[in-house]
Structure formats: C-alpha cells, structure tokens
Design a protein with these regions (language model features):
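Alpha-helical transmembrane segments of multi-pass membrane proteins
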Residues: 2-254, 266-269, 277-281, 304-314, ...
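Soluble small-group transferase modules, centered on the S-adenosyl donor enzyme superfamily
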Residues: 221-283, 288-295, 301-307, 446-545
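Alpha-helix N-cap and loop-to-helix initiation/capping positions
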Residues: 290, 397-398
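Acidic low-complexity segments
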Residues: 351-353, 357
Length: 545
C-alpha cells in the first residue's frame, strides 16, 4: 500500500501520541530556548578564566552561537520537510544534551589544548583567535542541534493554514519566555549558587528529561534514553565542582560570583587572589604586613604627594577595592587614616575579610565605582582607581567624563592614582590613551613604571610639585622600607607629556587596545620559551614552566 506525503506525516504523528497534545510541542520549544541562553551564559563563564570577560569575548560567543543557530534553523527546516519524523528531532535534542553535559568534564582541557597549539603558531590576535576556536569547537555543535528545534516543531504543530499564524506565534512566545528564564536563572541563581559546571549539568538534564518523556511515551528509543542517562550520571560525577585550574591542588579557595571566577592561593609568605586562570594577580596580601613588591607599593606615594597635610589625617577612596591590599598597607604605614573602598563584587569583599586580613574599620560599599561617585558629595585627599583587570577595562571608568568626576571629588592638591595594568610601547597604546585622557582633565601628570611587571602607575593632581613633595615627605617617614620605596618612585618618575589620544563615553576602544598589549606580552613570552625549547629541548621547556 502506498501513501501520499501528507498521509505519511499523519501516520508518523499518530505513532508519537504525546505530540497530539500541542502543549508538549510548546514545552519543547520553551526548554530549547531556555537551554540555548543558559549555555550561552555558561560559555562566557567557562571562557572568562582563560580569555577574560571583555566585550570582545562576549562578541565571539554571541557571534558563534548565532552562526550555529542559523545553520541549525536551515538544516532543521530541510530535515523536517524531507523526513518529518519527530524521533529524529528528539534524538538530536538527546545528543545536544549529552554534549552539554560533557562540557564540564572536557571543556577546560579543550581550551588549554587549543591555546597550547595556537600560542606557537599564531603571530597576532592570539586571544581573539583562541577564544573563537574554543567557542566553535565546544559550543557550535550542540547549539546547531538545538537550532533545528523551531523549524521542526513548526512542521509538527501546524495542522492547517487557517491557524498557522497563531501556532507559529505561540511557538515563538514559548521560545522567548524560555530564553528569558534561561538568561536570568543562570546569572542570578545557578552560577552564583552552584557554579558553572553544575549549571551546564542542570540544563543538560532538563533536555535529557524532555527527550526521555517523548521516547518513553512513544514506547521507542528506550535504549537511547538509558545510554544517555548513564552518560549524564557519569558526567555529573566527573564534572561536579571540577576546578578550572585543574593542575593546581593547593588552592585555599576556588569559586565563582556573579561577576568573576575567583581563586585564592597562599604560601608561607603571601596570599593571592586571581580572577584569571592563566595570567594576572588581582590582589595580594603579605603575611608579615610588609610591602608587596608590586604596584600597590608605588601607589603608596599618592598620600605623600600632598603638601602641608599629614597622611594619617587624610581620607582615601579606592575604586576597585579588590581584597584591600592598598587599604591594608595604608593602615600599616600611615596610621589611622580614613579609608573606604568600592567593590562591585561582594564575594571578593567577603574573601578580603576571610583570607586577606582587611581591617574591620575599612568600609567597603558594594557598588560600581562611577555610579558611587555620582551618588555622593564627599571629597577625598586621595582617590585610587584600580578597576582595570587583565583586558577587562570598564570603558565608563576610562573616559574624560569619568576622570572629570574624579577630579570634582578631590580636595585641594588631592591626588588621583591610577593603576594601568598593561604597559605598551607602541604609538597609540592603551596607556597612552588613558594618560592623554587624564591629562585633558588634570593639570599635572606623573608616571612611573613598576619594576618587574607590566604595570604603570599614574599620579594626577593640581599640585605641580608632586615629586618634590614626595621626596620631602618620604624622608620624614618612620619606616625605612617605605622611605626607600618612595625615593625610588621619585627617582624613576617622569612628567607625562600629553598627546591627543582621548577617550570619551561615546568612544573608548579599551577592549581592542588592551588586546593589542596582551598580544605583545604573549609574543614576548612565546619567544622566550621557543629559545629554551631550541636550546634544551622538551625537558628544558618543562623545567622552565
């Protein structure tokens, strides 16, 4: 007996009894949309510890996911026309779910493997290329499969042209509502509460359950469901609370907040907070309470650049408090000065009390630095801007408008000190942009390079004699280590000559500028390790790591 195409489709749908109820089709669309957004947000958190959470990385994630969804839409539509068997759709959902469940288990290894391969072969734009390739390898396939859902469901749910608009509109509404929930739940609930790995597992489990309901109700595909369930359970065991920095087994703390990946490590001398697996130190605390040897020591010059006022009588504001390294050092060396900090990540503030001995009398407000300045009227003797992290430089805290706001909150002869964490030497680099922007607001600018690092400290004030004031006050301090450090800052500082590289709220290309400096730093490291490899072979390379 032969059947027309329409009759074949009806017979297929009759075999899949649960699909006679359009509610299940709508729920499929709902959970597919929810899972796509959850995976997208999870992707940003998986990549951030390795490549940063800059706008560039977000662009790569969104772009690759949209490519995957578009290809999935095309394939799903053609597949549904060619063979309108719902088994194929729910099989694809099952495969996508398994792939998503595997991400916590193998994702970090894929990222590091791709980085290792590319670092010796890519001459520029390493972070962009590495993040793009990692995103393509890890996320395109499962989201391509989920992209086939909508056109397939349209095929199964439209019975006649009379109500086709209503049916397609309802499918779109369920997809959109699911996407909204898939946006808010990971960000505000699952990632802060249980982490990125379990977030992937939760939404993979939802998709497996969805496919299981279909296959079990149709009395087909029980083996597929059983195998998927076993793989999912294994992924839960292997991927649960797995470390991003899996090669380190001596971490005091590793976790996530709404804003950051967080890692605390310590040895006999110091405690370190990092927000990136591969590079950078976000905060540091010396257990003996002394100087750190890092940029915080150079920033200590700011209170000593103010004439005719004792440091202990000053009030200091820190934008980008971190774990309070600067505040702790100021308390030790300058006595009972008034210090308050602004930190957007309250989990970092909690870590500062738990691991970094932040003094109890240092007030920390959980807020965005610029928004905080807009909300207050107080003025300060010193304002430290330390909100720049790897290549994640907030554009709203690097513009003329922002630095004008800082200036308005400084007392007479007050000093703004800015930690610029990526020192570049080429024309038009990120530091030149920042320095020129600040110089367009402040009368006098002094900079000093931090020894042994990529940091540069910038001091801005209306006081033309900042360096001379620093020398005089340094010689009067009762701490010999601080005096020597401050005299070193004075000796190595230079007056900045302003240029025309200005950033505004409307135009501040901080991500691209930061990426250029990171590329230069990476290439410098690659040349170093290549030389070791050519001289001493693989053994020498391993010993140097």
């Amino acid at each position: 007996m032969s059947y027309t195409r329409g009759e074949k489709e009806r017979r297929i749908m009759e075999k899949s009894g649960i699909l006679k109820n359009k509610l299940f089709l709508y729920l499929t669309e709902f959970f597919a949309g929810m899972s796509v957004m959850a995976v997208e947000l999870g992707a940003s958190r998986l990549l951030a510890p390795y490549f940063s959470s800059s706008q560039i990385v977000w662009t790569i994630i969104i772009g690759t996911i949209m490519i995957a969804m578009a290809l999935g839409n095309i394939y799903g539509g053609k597949s549904a026309d060619r063979s309108p068997d719902p088994d194929k759709l729910y099989r694809r959902i099952l495969i996508a779910a398994i792939w998503i469940a595997l991400i916590p288990v193998v994702g970090k290894y894929i990222i590091l493997g791709i980085s290792a391969l590319l670092i010796f072969t890519v001459s520029s734009n390493f972070l962009i290329i590495a993040a793009f390739v990692a995103c393509m390898v890890i996320f395109v396939f499962p989201l391509f499969l989920l992209g086939t859902v909508t056109p397939s469901l349209v095929k199964y749910s439209v019975d006649s042209l009379d109500d086709s608009g209503k049916t397609v509109g309802t499918l779109g509404a369920f997809n959109t509502i699911g996407s909204i929930i898939g946006t808010f739940v990971p960000t505000f609930v699952t990632i802060p509460a249980v982490g990125t790995s379990i977030t992937f597992l939760i939404f993979a489990g939802i998709l497996i359950a969805l496919a299981a309901v279909y296959f079990l109700s149709s009395h087909r595909g029980q083996k597929k469901v059983a195998v998927s369930a076993v793989i999912f359970v294994l992924c839960c065991g292997l991927g649960y609370s797995d470390s991003f920095a899996f090669w380190q087994n001596d971490l005091s703390y590793e976790g996530e907040s709404i804003y950051n990946y967080l890692q605390v490590s310590e040895d006999d001398r110091r405690v370190i907070l990092s927000t990136n697996v591969l590079f950078g130190v976000q905060s540091l605390y010396m257990k003996d309470g002394g100087l750190t040897g890092m940029y915080y020591d150079y920033a200590m010059a700011a209170p000593l650049m103010i004439p005719d006022k004792k440091a202990e009588d000053m009030n200091v504001l820190i934008l980008g408090m971190g774990t309070g390294t600067y505040a702790t050092q100021c308390k030790k060396y300058f006595g009972d000065m008034s210090i308050e900090g602004v930190e957007i990540d309250d989990k970092i503030t909690a870590l500062s009390r738990q691991y970094f001995s932040l003094p109890d009398d240092v007030k920390v407000t959980t807020y965005d630095g610029r928004a905080y300045l807009q909300a207050i009227d107080e003025k300060y003797d010193v304002i430290m801007v330390d909100a720049y992290q790897d290549i994640t430089i907030p554009f709203q805290m690097s513009s003329v408008e922002f630095f004008t706001m800082v200036k308005e909150h400084l007392n007479e002869n007050g000093v703004m000190v800015v930690n610029m964490n990526m020192r570049g030497n080429n024309e038009g680099n990120i530091n030149q942009y920042l320095s020129d922007t600040i110089a367009s607001v402040f009368d006098h600018i002094v900079t000093v390079d931090v020894d042994g690092s990529t940091n540069r400290e910038l001091y801005a004030s209306s006081n033309a004699d900042m360096v001379k004031t620093l020398e005089n006050n340094a010689n009067e301090t009762g701490h010999s280590d601080l005096r020597d450090m401050m005299l070193h800052v004075a000796d190595t500082s230079s007056v900045y000559e302003a240029g025309d590289y200005i950033m505004t709220d409307d135009k501040a290309p901080v991500e691209l500028l930061g990426m250029q400096v990171i590329d230069q730093l990476i290439q410098g490291e690659v040349v170093y390790y290549k030389d070791i490899f050519e001289k001493d072979g693989i053994n020498g390379l391993l010993e140097s790591l």
